[in-house]
């Protein structure tokens, strides 16, 4: 009656961080995707890619595009053809959406892009500086502990994420943006947001958790979530970066109308039974 998993084929999650560093080219990722993941979507593709290449034309590789769209890597390479007819390879990553304001999102993008430019010159081949297993572990820590994480950095250095941001990442990002001739005022504006966020030890996730914990002590779960959502909408529209947001108060929401709630939205589920 018990199923043993010791000898079953290992399957990778379609939502994943990755398994190892790339060694030679992006083809390694596409090969892995084709081998490890079953086809979910298909269609009638008439294109003969090899024939097009032999005549100097650029294939759309529609089947590859569709299959790639069903595998959700943290950094996903996407093949496409630009409006000018030239093929390109772009990288989709999950850094940009973690605002919650537009200013925070652009600051995140500036930090990431600046670091990518400068670390190429400062570090070179990062595979010689840090193992993929440590990077994978850091990713898990960041997802679980956020701004309170402690990472394994290059050369096996242990460093809190705030210290890493202030001492390593932000200075490198500033230099990288300068190398790409970004206006000094823009560099200061966006890097100051990241620096203040680290100094204040506050980001979107931490603000939401602290706010919910505070409100939950003062009212029901439903009203706490309603006030929290309202506060997030108001703060987001203000354009003020998240590290400057105040903790929400119940009085911030002028009208709370729970009369239309379902039983499941206000009932208590934490019960003692005998």
Which residues does each PLM region occupy?
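C-terminal, helix-dominated tail/subdomain
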Residues: 1-26, 135-202, 212-213
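Loop-rich catalytic cores of soluble enzymes, especially ATP-dependent carboxylate-amine ligases
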Residues: 1-97, 126-130
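Generic recognition of stable, solvent-exposed alpha-helical segments in well-folded globular domains
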Residues: 25, 66-69, 88, 103-114, ...
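Charged, well-structured binding/catalytic surfaces in domain cores that contact anionic ligands
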Residues: 83-88, 100-103, 240, 250
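A generic short alpha-helical patch detector that favors 3-5-residue windows
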Residues: 85, 165, 255-259
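C-terminal catalytic subdomain
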Residues: 89-160
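Alpha-helix C-capping/helix-to-loop hinge sites
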Residues: 96-99, 180, 269-270
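Tandem CBS (Cystathionine beta-synthase) repeat/Bateman regulatory domains
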Residues: 195-274
């Amino acid at each position: 009656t018990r199923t043993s998993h010791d000898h079953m084929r290992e399957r990778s999650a379609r939502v994943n961080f990755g398994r190892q560093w790339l060694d030679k080219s992006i083809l390694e990722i596409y090969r892995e995707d084709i081998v490890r993941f079953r086809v979910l979507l298909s269609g009638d593709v008439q294109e003969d890619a090899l024939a097009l290449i032999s005549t100097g034309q650029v294939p759309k590789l529609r089947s590859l595009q569709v299959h790639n769209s069903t595998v959700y890597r943290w950094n996903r390479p996407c093949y496409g053809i630009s409006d000018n007819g030239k093929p390109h390879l772009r990288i989709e990553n999950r850094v940009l959406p973690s605002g919650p304001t537009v200013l925070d999102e652009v600051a995140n993008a500036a930090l990431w892009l600046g670091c990518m430019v400068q670390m190429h010159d400062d570090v070179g081949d990062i595979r010689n500086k840090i193992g993929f297993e440590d990077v994978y572990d850091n990713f898990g820590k960041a997802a679980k502990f956020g701004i309170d994480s402690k990472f394994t950095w290059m050369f096996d250095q242990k460093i809190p994420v705030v210290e890493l941001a202030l001492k390593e990442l932000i200075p490198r990002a500033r230099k990288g943006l300068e190398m790409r001739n970004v206006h000094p005022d823009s560099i200061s504006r966006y890097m100051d947001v990241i620096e203040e966020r680290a100094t204040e030890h506050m980001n979107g996730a931490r603000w939401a958790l602290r706010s919910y914990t505070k409100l939950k002590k003062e009212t029901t779960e439903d009203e706490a979530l309603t006030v929290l959502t309202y506060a997030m909408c108001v703060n987001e529209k203000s354009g003020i970066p998240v590290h400057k947001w105040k903790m929400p108060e119940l009085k911030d929401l002028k009208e709370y109308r729970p009369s239309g709630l379902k039983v499941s939205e206000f009932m208590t589920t934490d019960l003692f039974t005998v």
